[in-house]
Regions:
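Flavin-dependent oxidoreductase catalytic cores
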Residues: 1-408
């Protein structure tokens, strides 16, 4: 029996918690509940062919068994020509479409046993967040500000758009239920096109917000033409940047040099008009990383007031991410109309059974993400190692350490 002992949400009722297990739709795809496993990179655990081997399969399957209604893969890069990612470390489905399709079809079938849907991310690139990659304009590199990037030519931009569309076509042929565009958030390449501070172009892809959004619009139009209007597209969107300048964050959000909330809400409306079926929202960029990947001292649910503004502006689902690993806060946000579903990335690493424990009336049994950023993003960004979790030693190693029956 559910009992609410949460000090911050004493008014959350059993009925509020039950609503987390009602279905919702992304386009024509029905998701069984309001819990979505968020996208996280899986570099380092794929096989030599960059296939979705047993390690990858069991990692995702564990979250399906734990009750997640939607799983969104970590970023899959699409460019194999202009920014050529090493296939040994940065998986692109277009490096070997046959191998990708084989693994994706198997994963979709296995997830289906738990009525879990699969969306795959597709990325145009990382831009200035790492050295050696092209950007909308010549920009200082995030980690090495003394270095500057090379701007993409107009022809290169158009080719990158074509490769995004080609990847979406492969996803649909592989049985993947939908695509999430990565990403108008965190300051990745698409985000750099959309933000005025990183887009100083003078061609059709620069200038006004409409022009800066043109890359995103043309990708969406291409997917509709290739895959049909009913193939659902989600967009990962940062509603506000919290930056003062390159490599300078703004904790309070004052003197915003990146995306303001007002512009973020306007982008939501534009994306809906383009035919996007859901928005997966958060805040922050690499330049304000404590917002993009908030540590323990950032309060849970810190972005909900901003997400509510997006929800008021559009009629498509708002999937709320960033420190949402608290079922009471999720239930209250759903009840109060601040979001439609909840994107749990690090919390799904910490406890794959987060939804199931909530549904069974045992939310206090959830192993919480502690927001340390050490085992997950820290290993990837700082050490170049595969992700892990400080509180769950089986995370991304499920195939090596299968569950065992208790001996007592």
């Amino acid at each position: 029996m559910y009992e609410n002992h949460h000090p911050n949400t004493p008014e959350v009722t059993q009925e509020d918690m039950n609503q987390l297990f009602t279905p919702f739709n992304i386009g024509k795809v029905q998701i069984k509940n309001r819990f979505c496993m968020g996208p996280m990179g899986i570099s380092g655990i794929q096989g030599s062919l960059q296939d979705w081997n047993d390690v990858v399969q069991e990692y995702f399957l564990e979250r399906a068994k734990g009750g997640f209604g939607l799983i969104t893969t970590g970023v899959l890069f699409t460019d194999t020509e202009i920014d050529y990612f090493d296939p040994k470390s940065m998986k692109s489905p277009l490096h070997n479409p046959t191998v990708f399709r084989r693994g994706a079809e198997r994963l979709v079938e296995r997830l289906g046993a738990y009525d879990t849907k699969l969306f795959c991310q597709a990325s145009m690139g990382v831009g200035r967040t790492a050295p050696g990659f092209k950007t909308p304009s010549s920009l200082p590199i995030y980690s090495i500000p003394s270095m500057t990037s090379t701007a993409l030519t107009t022809d290169e931009v158009k080719r990158k758009i074509e490769l995004m569309v080609k990847t979406a076509e492969l996803y649909k042929k592989s049985g993947v239920h939908g695509i999430e565009l990565h990403a108008v958030h965190w300051g990745y390449l698409l985000d750099q096109f959309v933000m005025a501070m990183t887009n100083r172009r003078t061609d059709e892809y620069g200038g006004t917000l409409e022009n800066r959004m043109r890359v995103v619009k043309e990708i969406i139009e291409g997917i509709h033409q290739t895959c049909g209007d009913d193939y659902p597209i989600s967009v990962r969107l940062g509603l506000k940047s919290y930056v003062k300048a390159f490599n300078k964050a703004s904790l309070t959000g004052e003197n915003e040099a990146g995306r303001t909330l007002e512009e973020g809400v306007e982008i939501c409306k534009m994306l809906e008009s383009y035919g996007v079926k859901a928005l997966s929202v958060d805040v922050g960029t690499y330049d304000s990383f404590y917002y993009a990947c908030p540590p323990a001292y950032m309060p849970k649910g810190h972005g909900l007031k901003l997400y509510a503004k997006a929800k008021e502006a559009v009629n498509i689902p708002i999937l709320a991410g960033s420190r949402m690993g608290d079922p009471w806060i999720c239930a209250k946000a759903l009840r109060d109309g601040q979001a439609d579903a909840f994107v749990l990335s690090r919390p799904s690493l910490a406890d794959p059974e987060f939804p199931k424990k909530t549904e069974l009336g045992m939310p206090e049994k959830i192993r919480p993400c502690i927001g340390c950023n050490f085992g997950c993003i820290g290993r990837v960004e700082d050490q170049g190692l595969p992700p892990a979790c400080a509180v769950n030693p089986r995370a991304m190693r499920e195939s090596f350490y299968p569950p065992r029956k208790a001996t007592t």
